[in-house]
Amino acid sequence: MTYAPVNDVLSGKLAVDSEVTVRGWIRTRRDSKAGISFLAIYDGSCFNPIQAVVPNNLNNYDNEVLKLTTGCSVEVTGKIVESPASGQAFELAASDVKVVGWVEDADTYPMAKTRHSIEYLREVAHLRPRTNVIGAVARVRNCLAQAIHRFYHEQGYFWVSAPLITASDAEGAGEMFRVSTLDMENLPRTDAGKVDYNQDFFGKETFLTVSGQLNAEAYACAISKVYTFGPTFRAENSNTSRHLAEFWMVEPEVAFADLNTVAKLAEDMLKYVFKAVLAERRDDLEFFNDRINNEVIARLEQFVESDFAQVDYTDAIEILKNCGKTFEFPVEWGIDLASEHERFLAEEHFKAPVIVKNYPKDIKAFYMRMNEDGKTVAAMDVLAPGIGEIIGGSQREERLDILDARMREFGIDPEHMDWYRDLRRYGTVPHAGFGLGFERLVSYVTGMGNVRDVIPFPRTPRSASF
């Protein structure tokens, strides 16, 4: 017997009149007076379920088929036939229905066929992938991840797996989760009364990583073109629609490169993955366009056709000051652009994706290359219409003396970053990279307004269920 994904049947990959078995879950069951039941079966391979037409002459029709409810798992065997009804081209004329698993109590099943609020679905994150919306998010998320890997592979980049446990703070912000095996009720102390991390598992303080960038730099300074793609962690007490404590980052790093190199790389990558999702997950995007945000498809299509604008931070500040618009957060040189500023630039002024470059040094990280003016660093943010910042990057500081000075400005002892300084001591090169928050990318593509709804099991302040 041939087992077939629902997508293969509905897309016409399999011949009409061929016999197949589909395996999945019941979305709905509808019974006709003519003694026929219509089962809508989904397996997650595509957005739409397949309709199985079940006659009442099956041996288990009365005692099993008529008792099927939403969520029951089944194996249905039958012939592929052209569907006379509108909505899908093919359906299954069932000759056998095997019940694999029952829903214990249909009345209390959390995923009953009524539409649920997004907020409710967060409370049942282990069951929410069974819904149309979260199933579609999962397929789009997968498509984007595969497209990212494919893009970098085609561009000659090597994927590097950065460590999740680190002794370095890549952002210098200190908002990190500590990793420790010490007994919290009986902490060892030094003579000065501080916690003695020499007795901890690693013999020092360690944390969950906030970025794979510093490790990626080490490999870029040896094999030239690399990227990381993995989870990162921020102990930032932000309960907003844009923040997670655990999220995924895409971080390319390129040797012998400057800010312009990675600005072009960012544009090429975003256009590549958006073209991929438009081509490969059209059914899911049409659902998001219909139910979540009616600009999703048009926004992506316009994005891939747009030329990115570029503007210096200083010029962007002047644009914002002189635009005649009153912002909630006042505009002056030296501020970090707020979301309202970013979206005005992308949506109203440039009406296109825009790369803002050369930010004040005091609002950017220690590793960003100092510009000749001594006031700004070679940093960039990519701003997208509809969301604002989607990528942040920079040319890295390759000059050891300036890097050391910047570390001290941030209160970082250069000796604690000796391995990172070695990259400048031994064959230093100009290099650059950026970070893309993967959940923000998925949110942008799907139109889902909250990043908690585009990651399988969100981790946020005071919330770590499942």
UniProtKB/Swiss-Prot annotation:
It comes from the Bacteria. Keywords: Aminoacyl-tRNA synthetase, ATP-binding, Cytoplasm, Ligase, Nucleotide-binding, Protein biosynthesis. It is found in: Cytoplasm. GO terms for molecular function: asparagine-tRNA ligase activity; ATP binding; nucleic acid binding. The keyword Protein biosynthesis applies. Coiled coil: none annotated. Belongs to the class-II aminoacyl-tRNA synthetase family. NCBIfam families: asnS, PRK03932.1. Homodimer. This is Asparagine--tRNA ligase. It comes from Vibrio cholerae serotype O1 (strain ATCC 39315 / El Tor Inaba N16961).
